[in-house]
């Protein structure tokens, strides 16, 4: 009987390595949008991959730790409302990822569509609700500014995950042996 409590070693390692890679990707792959402090982020497809493979706790943790560290290293301060939004994005995608069977090489067109519906909803919750409302409540930022940033982030992050995230998940599933695909000769 396994009464193990807490995170597995595999999850802890995924969080540590994932957060480190998050910081590197956030630092070197951000593409400015022209909206202040809002970029096209290549890091979110990576977060979606980790959250889908390892689950909601890893997705939340990598998003939270990675975003907090990258904000601090790049700007000298951390925008906690956006850190929480990133963590929630990882959490929601990770919850949906539990329904997928990537480990057995399965990522069907129907699952791709479901994944993308969920990630778009997660982006809306994160960037159109959590981040701007947090900016208003915590930092007293102007509403029109933060909702413009949130709308831009929602669109760019949704597209980024739709394209790159789907490709990463399909490629990951393709590396796994499909259940029942091996036959004895």
Curated annotation (Swiss-Prot):
Q: How does it sit in the membrane?
A: Multi-pass membrane protein
Record's keyword terms, sorted? Cell membrane, Membrane, Transmembrane, Transmembrane helix
One cellular component term from this protein's GO annotations in UniProt: plasma membrane
Note the coiled coil stretches, chain numbering: none
Q: Which Pfam families match?
A: ECF-ribofla_trS
Where does the UniProt annotation locate this protein?
Cell membrane
Record field: transmembrane: 6-26, 46-66, 78-98, 113-133, 147-167
Q: Which domain of life is it from?
A: Bacteria
InterPro entries in UniProt: ECF_substrate-spec-like, UPF0397
Keyword Transport applies: no
Major localisation = membrane
Q: Does the keyword Secreted apply?
A: no
The record's section on HAMAP family has: UPF0397
- What family is it from? Belongs to the UPF0397 family.
Q: Which NCBIfam families does the record associate with it?
A: PRK13661.1
Please give the name of this protein.
Answer: UPF0397 protein LJ_1703
């Amino acid at each position: 009987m396994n009464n193990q409590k807490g995170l597995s070693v595999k999850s802890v390692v995924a969080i540590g390595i994932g957060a480190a890679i998050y910081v590197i990707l956030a630092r070197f792959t951000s593409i400015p949008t022209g909206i202040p402090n809002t970029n096209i982020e290549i890091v979110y497809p990576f977060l979606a991959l980790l959250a889908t493979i390892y689950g909601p706790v890893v997705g939340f943790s990598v998003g939270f730790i990675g975003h907090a560290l990258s904000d601090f290293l790049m700007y000298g301060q951390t925008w906690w409302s956006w850190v929480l939004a990133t963590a929630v994005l990882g959490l929601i995608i990770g919850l949906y990822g539990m329904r997928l069977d990537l480990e057995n090489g399965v990522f069907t067109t129907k699952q791709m569509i479901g994944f993308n519906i969920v990630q778009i909803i997660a982006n809306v919750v994160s960037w159109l609700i959590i981040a701007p409302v947090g900016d208003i409540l915590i930092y007293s930022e102007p509403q029109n500014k933060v909702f413009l940033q949130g709308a831009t982030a929602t669109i760019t992050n949704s597209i980024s995950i739709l394209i790159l995230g789907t490709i990463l998940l399909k490629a990951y599933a393709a590396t796994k042996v499909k259940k029942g695909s091996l036959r004895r000769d």
